[in-house]
Amino acid sequence: MAARCSIAFMIMASCLSVVVSGGLPGDLFALSVASKLRVDRNSTARASSDFGRIVAAAPEAVLHPATPAEIAELVRFSASSPSPFPVAPRGQGHSARGQSLAPGGVVVDMRALASRRGRVNVSAGAAPYVDAGGEQLWADVLRATLEHGLAPRVWTDYLRITVAGTLSNAGIGGQAFRHGPQIANVLELDVITGTGDMVTCSRDKDSDLFFAVLGGLGQFGIITRARIGLMPAPKRVRWVRLAYSDVATFTKDQELLISKRASEAGFDYVEGQVQLNRTLTEGPKSTPFFSSSDIGRLAGLASKSVSGVIYVIEGTMYYNESTSTTMDQKLESILGQLSFEEGFVFTKDVRYVQFLDRVREEERVLRSIGMWDVPHPWLNLFVPRSRILDFDAGVFKGVFAGANPVGVILMYPMNTNMWDDCMMAVASDDDVFYAVGLLRSAAVIGDVERLEKENEAVLAFCHNEDIGCKQYLPYYTSQDGWQRHFGAKWSRVADLKAKYDPHRILSPGQRIFSSPASMVVVSM
């Protein structure tokens, strides 16, 4: 274990960049929230990096608020100061490129709010909903809603991340083809703007702020509460994985499963994975779904393919005791419409909670072998359906030809009409688009540089071939890049930034607008 820790530290030290910045205004420490500010090295160090472990940026202080009002006081002070400083809310720090960091400013430890009781409240009426603090983990929201036999409709694959964190991006998962992203299921928000105002907003009240904050990358306000619609929670899940050796057949079947015709009585969740080379033998070991013999069979299927690439559809059907007798019949009806490789059907029957929290077990496995706290140079893209086969040929069978990635590659479709274009999240012009997640980890020294070069090659391919990709959990180093990303929404982004965060205080780690803090970047 000591050796693994040493290796992890060397990897991190070899790839991080550090931001050195000036101090905070002295009268900040005369505020009533001063007792909640920590400036010691241990506190600032913990808030200096994120899950990606690619970037490090030291804040001057960390705020551990007891109430949202204390966050608002901090933001108001910065906004009214002759020397405004950056403020960044941080939940679990699950960003990959320093988006949750505040170089030269103050990081707000949102999880500190979770120590107060009553931050998750369920209303189980005719139109049920949950009021959840922005700092709450989705796992905690699930636990609270299940006590009432209810649950949110859409889930990210990993539940140990915060409500505000996912809603600031979009929040996608295998249920999004039916219900849209998580932001499409929000009814109301409490937001602290960049001027320190505390605003309750919805589609009908202060709607410009409501739509700006959902998918707004933290640029317009800090979400402290979200009201999220609920549905009756099922008890059990029939969990299915189907293997393919042909990408055209794989995508055709995925698109059938998310179509209106199939989805009315079909899968409740649809995702997919691309397995190539090392991911066939290493990736499945971190999940309890496949047995050793299953993995061997999948590797054998890949060996028969010229490219060495295979594809896996992952789907689920929810059910309760009252519908269990018809489950097998419904599943057989769906499978009869699909063209997966004969004999490559893998099924499990699990509790609803066990399925939703499935990545938790994978996390435990990866932590046990020292592969969780390593750099994650992830790249997530939305690829138009019209170009997904070109993307497959150019990336999986081009850029990644001969590669041996450690991690997971996701690829699954969503329906564009389930996304609200009033919100700031950017999807696709096609009626169907694919979420492609290159969720790879740097296992040894030197991997970060290699993986980053491959990411650059992927982006270059998409640009040169005019694939029309959009980044999800985006990262750009110039405002030109951000303008291209937002496209027609850019003017609205700029106008709303000027309205709700005129001093460009909030979430500087996104690098969309210049930060009020001066920064010097040096290599470690």
Curated annotation (Swiss-Prot):
Cellular component annotations (GO), alphabetically ordered: extracellular region
GO molecular function, one term: oxidoreductase activity
Cofactor: FAD
Homology family: Belongs to the oxygen-dependent FAD-linked oxidoreductase family.
Residues that bind FAD: G91, G93, S95, Q99, D157, T162, S168, I172, I223, Y472, S507, Q510
Annotated glycan sites: N42, N121, N277, N320
PROSITE patterns: FAD_PCMH, OX2_COVAL_FAD
Protein name from the UniProt record: Cytokinin dehydrogenase 7
Gene it is expressed from: CKX7
Species the sequence originates in: Oryza sativa subsp. japonica (Rice)
Pfam short name (any one): FAD_binding_4
Function: Catalyzes the oxidation of cytokinins, a family of N(6)-substituted adenine derivatives that are plant hormones, where the substituent is an isopentenyl group.
